[in-house]
């Protein structure tokens, strides 16, 4: 029933993915060997969304792991849940992409992509009714960004009617790992705009801020950051895996969140986030969750929702709570902050309630918002891209692998178009929308 196939690519994607499977295993009561050791039938009822049951009663994740170098794969394999994955589903090259997206998209990645697609096909054939794919990758490196988007476009050709959800780690504004991040990110966004259905935007700096400010961690590690991401990932699909009062799936999510097909880049947030020290001083209530969930400091990407307006948003609550209270709180948010929502989409906040809370919590909520302020993120990457591209800096690394300068120009203009589309809908008012329609009708009559 409604399976989701999980794909992780590159170093970042594999590290997030490894953490994600730890979280999902804990929720379904599955131990590191793939055996079930939980205490509730609900954990097994829809375990097949993310797991395949093998003949000996082991649960095997529906996951495909790919990378262009064996390093990260080895660390996943030797990690706590390394033996749960099917050994054939590790697909890796030897040379690495070296942060060069031309290698990941055209040379090294293109050689490996067929074997990845074979594994994806095998997994998809095992599914009863495949709902879609979720891809974890970063956009700054070479493998996750370029080979990830190459795989997405290939899967798009083969499974055009299945949902494609991505968790994409964008380059951070101040923290940068590599100098060519703006190139790789722009080339990837160019692909994601066309081929992905829903794109959850994350970035390390915002996650670090949450760890410092909210969780009061003095030295956050990537493990802590990935834990935040995996809590959100698990929240997005909880309705598929556990019974709830108001269910949603990937397609319902897309229909409720995407007013225009190109604008499918979402901000995500998670509540409750509290530091270990102050946990016992906080009551977990629906108002408290709602307040924290809509807080700008809680967003996992470096864009401030107060600088733009929400086109749509979706809140997924988990735990035993009254739906009436959830609806009241959501209405309350919309009424108090009406200037932050566009007025030409009525009822633009969807809420979902799932009865089973995450492991170790009484209640939790996941937030997904389609806000025009995400353009800050694209604009920032675009400025960095232009600064380097104007001088053709580092370009020989890409053209040497067979890329053309025109591709860069195309990707740049696509990114700039995206920014101006977000800006256009941020400025639009209800009256203008009416005028557009009148003009269009006038044109038709002519």
From Swiss-Prot:
Tissues of expression: Found in areas of rapidly dividing tissues.
Keywords associated with the record: Cytoplasm, Cytoskeleton, GTP-binding, Magnesium, Metal-binding, Microtubule, Nucleotide-binding
GO biological process: microtubule cytoskeleton organization; mitotic cell cycle
Ranges for region Disordered: 422-446
One GO location term (cellular component): cytoplasm
Family that this chain belongs to: Belongs to the tubulin family.
Role of this protein: Tubulin is the major constituent of microtubules, a cylinder consisting of laterally associated linear protofilaments composed of alpha- and beta-tubulin heterodimers. Microtubules grow by the addition of GTP-tubulin dimers to the microtubule end, where a stabilizing cap forms. Below the cap, tubulin dimers are in GDP-bound state, owing to GTPase activity of alpha-tubulin.
Protein name, as recorded: Tubulin beta-1 chain
């Amino acid at each position: 029933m409604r399976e989701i196939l999980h794909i992780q690519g590159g170093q970042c994607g594999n590290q997030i993915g490894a953490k994600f499977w730890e979280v999902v295993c804990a929720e379904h009561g599955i131990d590191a060997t793939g055996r079930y050791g939980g205490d509730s039938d609900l954990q097994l009822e829809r375990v097949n969304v993310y797991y395949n049951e093998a003949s000996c009663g082991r649960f095997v994740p529906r996951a495909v792991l790919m990378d262009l170098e064996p390093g990260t794969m080895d660390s996943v394999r030797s990690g706590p849940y390394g033996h749960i994955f099917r050994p054939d589903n590790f697909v890796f090259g030897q040379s690495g992409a070296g942060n060069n997206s031309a290698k990941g998209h055209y040379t090294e990645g293109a050689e490996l992509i067929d074997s990845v697609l074979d594994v994806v096909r095998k997994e998809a054939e095992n599914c009863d009714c495949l709902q879609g794919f979720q891809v974890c990758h970063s956009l700054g490196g070479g493998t996750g960004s370029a080979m990830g988007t190459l795989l997405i476009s290939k899967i798009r050709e083969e499974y055009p009617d299945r949902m494609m959800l991505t968790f994409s780690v964008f380059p951070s504004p101040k923290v940068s790992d590599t100098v060519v991040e703006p190139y790789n990110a722009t080339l990837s966004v160019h692909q994601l705009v066309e081929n992905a259905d829903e794109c959850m935007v994350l970035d390390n700096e915002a996650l670090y801020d949450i760890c410092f400010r909210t969780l009061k961690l003095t030295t956050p590690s990537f493990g802590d950051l990935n834990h935040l991401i995996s809590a959100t990932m698990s929240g997005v699909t909880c309705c598929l895996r556990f019974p709830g009062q108001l269910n949603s799936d990937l397609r319902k999510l897309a229909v409720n969140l995407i007013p225009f097909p190109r604008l499918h880049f979402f901000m995500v947030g998670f509540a409750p986030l509290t530091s270990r020290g102050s946990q016992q001083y906080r009551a977990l209530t629906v108002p408290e969750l709602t307040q924290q969930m809509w807080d700008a400091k809680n967003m996992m990407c470096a864009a401030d929702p107060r600088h733009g307006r929400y086109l749509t948003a979706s809140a997924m609550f988990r735990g035993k709570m009254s739906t009436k209270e959830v609806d009241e709180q959501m209405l309350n948010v919309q009424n108090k902050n009406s200037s932050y929502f566009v007025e030409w989409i009525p009822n633009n906040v969807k809420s979902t309630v799932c009865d089973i809370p995450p492991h170790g919590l009484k209640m939790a909520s996941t937030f997904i918002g389609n806000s025009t302020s995400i353009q800050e993120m694209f604009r920032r990457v675009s400025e960095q891209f232009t600064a380097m591209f104007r001088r053709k800096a580092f370009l020989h690394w890409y053209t040497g692998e067979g890329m053309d300068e025109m591709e860069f120009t195309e990707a740049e203009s696509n990114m700039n178009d995206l920014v101006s589309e977000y800006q256009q809908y941020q400025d639009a008012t209800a009256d203008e929308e009416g005028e557009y329609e009148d003009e269009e009708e006038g044109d038709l009559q002519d």
